UniProtKB/Swiss-Prot annotation:
Belongs to the class-II aminoacyl-tRNA synthetase family. Phe-tRNA synthetase alpha subunit type 1 subfamily. The gene is pheS. Its cofactor is Mg(2+). This is Phenylalanine--tRNA ligase alpha subunit. It comes from Rhizobium leguminosarum bv. trifolii (strain WSM2304). Binds 2 magnesium ions per tetramer. InterPro entries: aa-tRNA-synth_II, aa-tRNA-synth_II/BPL/LPL, Phe-tRNA-synth_IIc_asu, Phe-tRNA_ligase_II_N, Phe_tRNA_ligase_alpha1_bac, Phenylalanyl-tRNA_Synthase, tRNA-bd_arm.
Amino acid sequence: MSDIDQLNASLLAEIAAANDEAALEAVRVSALGKKGSVSELLKTLGAMTPEERQTRGAAINVLKNAVTEALAARKATLRQEAINARLKAETVDVSLPVRSSPAERGRIHPISQIVDEITAIFADMGFSIAEGPDIETDYYNFTALNFPEGHPAREMHDTFFFHPDENGERKVLRTHTSPVQVRTMETQKPPIRIIIPGKTYRQDSDATHSPMFHQVEGLVIDKKANVANIRWVLEEFCKTFFEVDSVTMRFRPSFFPFTEPSFEVDIQCDRSGPIVKFGEGTDWMEILGCGMVHPNVLRYGGLDPDEYQGFAWGMGLDRIAMLKYGMPDLRDFFNADVRWMTHYGFRPLDMPTLFGGLSA
């Protein structure tokens, strides 16, 4: 056995015997360091004849490569063994109670809670969730929703526009979640029953408005959808959401470009106290907008309005959260105030269900 073969066997044995990364690093330095055994052999290449370099030089390079590969493989093995040992030692007892210190107790944001509540309600009615991009094209945000040229919503004072792209097109931060209606109609055959929760953006900011706010809307498309269906769906939703036995609602004629006929919906309530009470009283409060999907919107979605019809509704999540839980200022939703979250937030394990209670 040549000296190179002996050195190779010795180094590979030392590498295999290394029990941790520190020991392995010591072997690497002794072999490949500036004065390592393999490095010293490489220094002799310059003094060799061409014939020796072809044979002995090649053998030295093979040795170097073998040692390098063995070091890398052993290092990977040691790291995996360390991870396995750590995982074995670190156990989590899932039966332990949640930490009770107020400083350590997390809270679910009211908006997340409201989304979960609404999802639970409409899932029980057979609806699914649909989503879409926050950055929209003019086509999906306006044109496909029957907004005419020159509509105020297309102006800079109301909508956040991006700079024009290379084609001159200006994208927008969506002003409503309605573009998802058209996107869904393009990709899904009727019957369609969806709700669309998400962020929306408009240039408005005060105690009840924010430049970024949350909406949810619903869409039903089939061959027999009608206004009576809208009323039933919304009444069932409001009863369940506000956790009352009955609600009285009134539908006022209104105008939205994407529905015809269009309605604004008021719910009867009692506003005499600091908290609005639903299901009682003689006051009225506007809560959402709705209507039958405009035939032009159906056409943009690739559906024949002579065969299909539908209804849609939309409401502000932030606003109904304020109404239900008595929050006075919308801006507090986004201030990241731990005290506010401690007061208005929800415990993580209290998931809203129709059987256990939405806001338990």
